[in-house]
Amino acid sequence: MENYSSLLIGGKQFSSRLMVGTGKYKSTQDMVASLSNSETEIITVAVRRIKNDQTGENLLEKINWEKYWMLPNTAGCVNSDEAVRIAILGRELAKLSGQEENNFVKLEVIPDKKYLLPDPIETLKAAEILIKKGFAVLPYINADPILAKRLEEIGCATVMPLGSPIGSGQGLLNLSNIRIIIENSKVPVIIDAGIGVPSEASQAMEIGADGVLINSAIAQAANPPLMAQAINYSVKAGRQAFLAGRIKKQDFAVASSPEKNISI
């Protein structure tokens, strides 16, 4: 049987299906402890934060880059030109951290400041450019099955449909479209944004997602390290449940005890 924790992205294998963000933590200590408890191997880093913020430089120093694979993201970019420029800077940051072969980028193009919804047209445009430049592109998108398939066809390493708006904690609001994306996709589907509690992370895995990316649910919890551990367990449980196969839903009851040959 397939190992529940085996995940292949861009030719690189990972033993965890949980990706974790590095923003919004109250302290560096909380972040480091949460990363450890999550057992993640892929962590997202906002390139603009590292480039412009002194605490960003501290972030590079505080994380053991021999243990974690950096996933630079283009958060804050509002068009494809900005996203391409920041992605290139992100690749250089990965090299500075010792990951010479790291060409991953989490592509975010978000002009909408209120709901932080991704721009599908600019995302597709940026993805095409970055793929030609040798990037393994992990695009953050709305739960749009047509866009997801188009991004797969041009060579994206994954597709990352949102569960609900970033940081909203509303869970998986568009399950029908997410299911279609999972059913049609030949690349890993990572649910990104909106997950608020472990049960929602488990639900994403139970319906067949290949992984989840979580930041706010951990970083803004009352006890981030404990929440990271809980979500870690839920992702593993959800994956195992998917592989095990759930019973069919029915409109009537089915007795679990035998109805024949019962001795009294």
Swiss-Prot record:
Gene3D superfamilies: Aldolase class I (3.20.20.70). Keywords: Cytoplasm, Schiff base, Thiamine biosynthesis, Transferase. It comes from the Bacteria. Pathway: Cofactor biosynthesis; thiamine diphosphate biosynthesis. Its EC number is 2.8.1.10. Homotetramer. Forms heterodimers with either ThiH or ThiS. This is Thiazole synthase. It comes from Prochlorococcus marinus (strain AS9601).
